[in-house]
């Protein structure tokens, strides 16, 4: 387990969450969702490193998180759902310029 990597991911997660809060206050919903996703992503990466699991893709992070934390019952299913929903919203916000992202969707993230 690399404590420096874990600390780095946790620090980045906190920074992303703080940025998301500021973006929500300014009604920048697309950017807010993206920052929310990365806050969760960094937190999950830190958890995976604790178990000496390294991944190189977003999909791998979601799969490994589910396998090692959700399916084992160590963490509740709702966390996996939150990761998936936030990932899906980020994909829409980042890559589908036609769709409108609402405050309600942002608050789900």
Task: Identify the residue ranges that each predicted region occupies.
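Terminal alpha-helical segments
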Residues: 1-109
């Amino acid at each position: 387990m690399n404590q420096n990597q874990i600390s780095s991911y946790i620090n980045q997660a906190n920074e992303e969450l703080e940025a998301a809060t500021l973006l929500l206050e300014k009604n920048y919903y697309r950017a807010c969702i993206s920052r929310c996703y990365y806050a969760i992503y960094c937190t999950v990466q830190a958890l995976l490193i604790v178990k000496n699991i390294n991944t190189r893709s977003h999909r791998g992070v979601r799969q490994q998180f589910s396998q090692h934390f959700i399916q084992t019952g160590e963490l509740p299913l709702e966390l996996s759902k939150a990761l998936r929903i936030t990932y899906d919203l980020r994909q829409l916000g980042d890559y589908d310029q036609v769709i409108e992202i609402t405050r309600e969707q942002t608050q789900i993230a």
